[in-house]
């Protein structure tokens, strides 16, 4: 027998997802959504939804009068599993020390690698669970989590196991990415390490939960050809390619992503309109991470070149993510939406789409409707104490998430009928 899990009704604005044509939001005034057996069963005007799914019959009924209801945020780029504390590096950066100089001195990624290697399995699971808790409280219901702080086969596999263990017990839907090629360990050179990733790490990682293989394609890290080798090998093991590309320099990672038909290319601070066109032609989702530029005091990526390149093409024009990591310590997609509008001058509707439906495409989840509220999609529903989606960027620095439902079950907040 079907179960009416939840009815959220009376929303001043209900955000469904991309409108017909895909380039703007479909919204309803006085909107409602009903969730049955974990999936959206009805969405539309409150009177129509309540006539078919009375609130008094629901396990959870939420009166969203005066509020905005939208799909749960999708965060397509995080390094949420880590150990240790690098807040002292934050202070050094404020004094003007470049991140690459910190990395060269054994800080940055390599410092976190040492902490992760020293952490117990239980500590890794607990650390990730704590990060997911905060993400969920800020409205994220689907999140990618990368490895990459192991840099050896044993620790990378321990990270994969920890991600799987935390994900199995958490309401956030976790998508796992193998990132063995996150940095070059200080006891080897890049070519030798690439061989180790291909020969040792990838065969072991293929037995775990990873869906994607990512590489940090950047000057003084991994070249385009080294990245290609790793991603080709990952694909042979069933892992779809992703890239960190054009973050500090324009090295050619975006074009590589296009050549490979990668699922996404991420960062892209130094990408050009030609790169944007190549990604759009290849159906690669660009993932912009404005919080990283914010904390590093770098110029923001230009979303308009990606939006323009995507015109009249299929696929998501652009996505947004937090890049949650010890160097960019934010869990809030709402904050990222605000940065996208106030820093990168995105329209609020575009920013909300880039944090929901378009972000799902960066995880190859767009086809199943993740990041939308349509009949048959997962019942991941966000209730925000604001009169419209515009207030997400308009009111920065405030977590106005009032309730989060995952598969129709209250995970954060709630309220009465």
Curated annotation (Swiss-Prot):
Zn(2+) binds at residues 77, 79, 244, 323. One of its GO terms (biological process) is L-histidine catabolic process. Fe(3+) binds at residues 77, 79, 244, 323. Binds 1 zinc or iron ion per subunit. Coiled coil: none annotated. It catalyses: 4-imidazolone-5-propanoate + H2O = N-formimidoyl-L-glutamate. GO terms for cellular component: cytoplasm. Its main location: cytoplasm. N-formimidoyl-L-glutamate binds at residues 149, 325. Its EC number is 3.5.2.7. Keywords: Cytoplasm, Histidine metabolism, Hydrolase, Iron, Metal-binding, Zinc. It is found in: Cytoplasm. InterPro entries: Amidohydro-rel, HutI, Metal-dep_hydrolase_composite, Metal_Hydrolase. Transmembrane segments: none annotated. The keyword DNA-binding does not apply. One of its GO terms (molecular function) is iron ion binding. 4-imidazolone-5-propanoate binds at residues 86, 149, 182, 247. Pathway: Amino-acid degradation; L-histidine degradation into L-glutamate; N-formimidoyl-L-glutamate from L-histidine: step 3/3. Its cofactor is Zn(2+); Fe(3+). NCBIfam families: hutI. Catalyzes the hydrolytic cleavage of the carbon-nitrogen bond in imidazolone-5-propanoate to yield N-formimidoyl-L-glutamate. It is the third step in the universal histidine degradation pathway. Belongs to the metallo-dependent hydrolases superfamily. HutI family. This is Imidazolonepropionase. It comes from Halobacterium salinarum (strain ATCC 700922 / JCM 11081 / NRC-1).
């Amino acid at each position: 027998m079907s179960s009416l899990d939840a009815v959220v009704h009376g929303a001043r604005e209900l955000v469904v997802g991309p409108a017909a044509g895909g380039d703007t939001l479909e919204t309803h005034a006085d909107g409602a959504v009903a969730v049955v057996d974990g999936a959206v069963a009805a969405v539309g005007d409150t009177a129509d939804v309540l006539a078919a799914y009375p609130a008094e019959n629901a396990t959870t009924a939420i009166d969203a009068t005066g509020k905005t209801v939208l799909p749960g945020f999708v965060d397509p780029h995080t390094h949420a599993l880590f150990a240790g504390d690098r807040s002292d590096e934050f202070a050094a950066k404020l004094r003007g020390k470049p991140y690459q100089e910190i990395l060269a001195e054994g800080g940055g990624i390599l410092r976190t690698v040492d902490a992760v290697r020293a952490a117990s399995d239980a500590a890794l699971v607990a650390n990730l669970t704590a990060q997911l808790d905060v993400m969920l409280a800020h409205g994220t219901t689907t999140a990618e989590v990368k490895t990459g702080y192991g840099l050896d086969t044993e620790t990378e596999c321990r990270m994969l196991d920890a991600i799987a263990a935390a994900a199995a017990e958490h309401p956030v839907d976790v998508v796992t990415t193998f990132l063995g090629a996150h940095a070059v360990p200080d006891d080897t050179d890049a070519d030798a390490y690439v061989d180790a990733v291909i020969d040792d790490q990838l065969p072991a990682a293929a037995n775990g939960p990873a869906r994607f293989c990512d590489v940090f394609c950047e000057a003084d890290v991994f070249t385009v050809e080294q990245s290609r080798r790793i991603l080709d090998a990952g694909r042979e093991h069933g892992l779809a390619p992703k890239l960190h590309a054009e973050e500090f320099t324009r090295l050619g990672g975006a074009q590589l992503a296009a050549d490979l038909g990668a699922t996404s290319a991420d960062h892209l601070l130094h990408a050009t309109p030609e790169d944007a066109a190549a990604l759009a032609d290849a159906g690669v989702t660009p993932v912009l991470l404005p919080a990283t530029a914010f904390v590093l005091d770098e110029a923001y990526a230009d979303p308009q070149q990606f939006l323009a390149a995507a015109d009249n093409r299929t696929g998501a024009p652009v996505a947004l993510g937090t890049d949650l990591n010890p160097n960019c310590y934010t869990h809030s997609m709402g904050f990222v939406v605000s940065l996208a509008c106030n820093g990168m001058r995105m329209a609020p509707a575009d920013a909300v789409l880039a944090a929901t439906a378009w972000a799902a495409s960066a995880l190859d989840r767009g086809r199943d409707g993740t990041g939308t509220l349509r009949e048959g999609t997962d019942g991941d529903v966000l209730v925000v104490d604001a009169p419209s989606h515009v207030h997400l960027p308009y009111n920065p620095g405030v977590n106005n998430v009032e309730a989060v439902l995952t598969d129709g079950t209250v995970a954060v907040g709630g309220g009465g009928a």
